[in-house]
Amino acid sequence: MNMSTNQGRTTGQSLPNGMLEDNYPRNMWWVAARGDEVGEKPLARWLLEKPVVLYRLKDGTPVALDDRCPHRWAPLSAGRVVDDLLICPYHGIEFGSDGRCTRIPTQDTIPDSMRVRSYPLVESGAFVWIWMGDPEKIPACDPPVDMSYTADPNWSVVLGYYEVAVNWVLIRENVLDLTHIAYLHSKTFKQDDWASVPEVSMDGDTVTYRQDFDLGPLSPLFCHAMGFSEAKPVKREQEGRMPSLAVSFSDWNVHDPEAQPGVRADFLMRGCHIVTPSQRGKTHYFWGAAFDIPNISTELCERTRASVTEAFDEDKALLEQLYAQVSMDPCGVDYPEIGRLGDTAGVRVRQVLQRKLAAEDRSLSG
């Protein structure tokens, strides 16, 4: 891909036209759901433009199948689970967790073709990961990202979810570009020192960034959960990491220079941003704000949730406006994207994406 982050240079033609197409790798792990969403009652979810049904067996094992009965294509998610069997709501045809049909009420014989595809799942912390690509390629690919900290009692974790009417890449780039915080989030984050360019590096397909900040107040989104007032000056370091196109982390390392002897002075807030393509022009966005402080009160957690939601509502509104405009008028080369120095992390994302798609003999078009 021909892209540059130099000022005045175009960022390449993989987007915006590419954001209107099927531009996600299939041979990788994506997050299907939060673990607490998946229970004995079938859950319908579109993932990578496919209808999928998720549920749990009696022993707690999560299951994912194509959400379409092969008989008359009725959604299996509208059925029910009885004794670990998923029963189609239309004619009562039953399926096991491997997708094989186990019973057709009107006959004794079961054709081999009466089956649905099952998908490998891995549960890590608060999230369930799904593989929807070629199963034979699983051993050669990176495993799901470890999210075990989201279920660690030594952390207090706040989770949230959006369905956003945009291509998934827009969200992935947004959460790695923190230079927009001083502008788009001026009323919520209330920090104007984000406009400077972070230091970005790359190791294989992992994109990282780092930025140090002068002494100043912590954002009201997170200060209360850490026990600070909105005016309390602290020292903070920002470290971000994208180990997978599906997830990125944003670590806020906070130091209180005025902490009294014997009083804790260092804290960590870890943001996680998980994106999974849903349908064309729709994306599942799971977010998390985790503090390395056990047993933060429910009141403070809910206050954090409300504040973060208010800020992310601002992202959602702008990105959906952007995507709607590009969808109606995909200008392509007539209006190429013009890069700036703050785009480095986003450009690295596109480079990783291009390599993943090329490995599947696909590419982004412009």
Stretches with model-predicted labels:
Residues 2-18, 24, 29-156, 366:
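Rieske [2Fe-2S] iron-sulfur-binding domain
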Residues 61, 136-366:
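C-terminal catalytic domain of Rieske-type non-heme iron oxygenases
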